[in-house]
Amino acid sequence: IRLREFNMAELEYFIDPDDPPIDDLSKWPDRVCMVPDPDGPRPGEFEMSFKEALESGIVKHPTVAWFLAMTMEFLEFVGIDRTKVRFRQHAGSEMAHYASDCWDCELKGEHGWVEVVGIANRTCHDLESHEEHSKSSLLRAWRTYEKPVKKKSEVLKPVGSVIGPTFRERAGEVSSALSQLQEIPSSFPFELELPDGTIVHIGEDMVNSAVEDSVVSGEYFTPHVIEPAFGIDRIIWHILDHNYKEVDKEGERYTILSLNPEIAPADLVVLPLFDKDGMD
């Protein structure tokens, strides 16, 4: 459906891919309608809890399952009829290339099933793309080990008598860049990128290879991101659709809108029982 406004509420939720937060999904025991990837191993429509969906592998990530459960809880709180809710997994052919899993929450109303929420596991695509183009590693996070680890690592030590005359005023930048190499090149010469993007070529005579012992307390990693996106206007439209009704009582037509007091625009209203001059 097309509405006059298109307001979105989005969250970028960053997690450690090796240690994702895992919530107790048994807090949401009720079953909901799940529609897995039609091209996957379990096509069809199923009634299951979020815990069952995760344990069966239909939902691929615990944090995604948690957001699905929280979405259902929120929609019920604001007045959505749970019998008119389903969660549909994107088919492989429609999923964005950077996502490893993506689910839409759809609500049934006057215009059929309409997407109102999208929850995507965007993995590390965004931050790695930013790092690639900005040449900055500032968006990495630090993971502390439970116990410090002894580690042997190969390093390249600059030969000052060669680096200095070759690169002159930039010799310090070259030496610093060499000390920060994450992977040691397998052959010479190799290209080395400086902080400003300049590429220099390092020959075998410019460095000495050495093995150093160190005690490491942790490591930097690129966080993954789970992104829930809520279509505010579509949700409001379906709140009205699910809670508006007209009933006949004793020959009269009554129009009723039942809203959760938490979201109702007014706590109460006082109205006259009949129309009469001077009573309004």
Locations of regions flagged by a protein language model:
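NTP/phosphate- and nucleic-acid-binding module
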Residues: I1-D280
